Amino acid sequence: LMVQLLLKSEKNSYEEHVAKNAASCARALAKHYGCDSKHYEAVCKYALAIFDKLKKLHGLNARRRLILELACILHESGSFINTHHKLLGTYDILKNTEFYGLTAEESLLIATTASTDEMHMIDITEPFENLSHKNSLVVTKLCTILCVANALDKSQNCKFDNISLKLKENELIVYAETDKNVHLEKWAFGECTT
């Protein structure tokens, strides 16, 4: 029993170490590719709050939460290659990137998740062809969360300081206050929630 408790403690410590260092590496990579840190930090904050609120519905674990976090940080990296085809550029950059403590399969999950947005979530089929059925379902869930989070900062001006979330039956209600114009965010939010 003592060995199991120690092993569990060590595993949790190791997972925290991996998550911290993988996120640090992703931020360094995002800086290299000229990603806007205020934007990706806002998207991260929103996405992780949504992930945590929907945990009972999506059933994904902490490792999948880390994949979502890294995808949020790096979702704009493809603009470095081509601003007109940034999603494909993001996929190409990330699919072969080695992330600290993660497997090649997990890098592919990050690449596929990061290379979607509210307008192209369904259109990108090639990345999904490289995934198992189980991982396709995981990525679909993560993409949906990322799209909603990205829509909340579509203008990349961090218009919402905080959001609050309420789960009512199977519906997620997002509350956000601001005195700024949020027409673009409302439009993008509508695109990814219909």
Model-derived segments and their meaning:
Residues L1-E16, K45-L48:
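Oxyanion-binding/catalytic loops of NTP- or PPi-dependent enzymes
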Residues M2-E10, L70-E76, L165-L172:
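Core structural elements
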Residues S9-H32:
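Long, charged amphipathic helices and adjacent flexible linkers at domain junctions
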Residues A26-A30, H39, K45-L165:
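Divalent metal-dependent catalytic cores for phosphoryl transfer on phosphate-bearing substrates
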Residues C35-S37:
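Cytosolic transmitter module of two-component histidine kinases
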Residues Y40, L142-I145, E185-C192:
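Generic alpha-helical secondary structure
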Residues S155-T194:
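Low-complexity, glycine/alanine/valine/leucine- and proline-rich hydrophobic stretches
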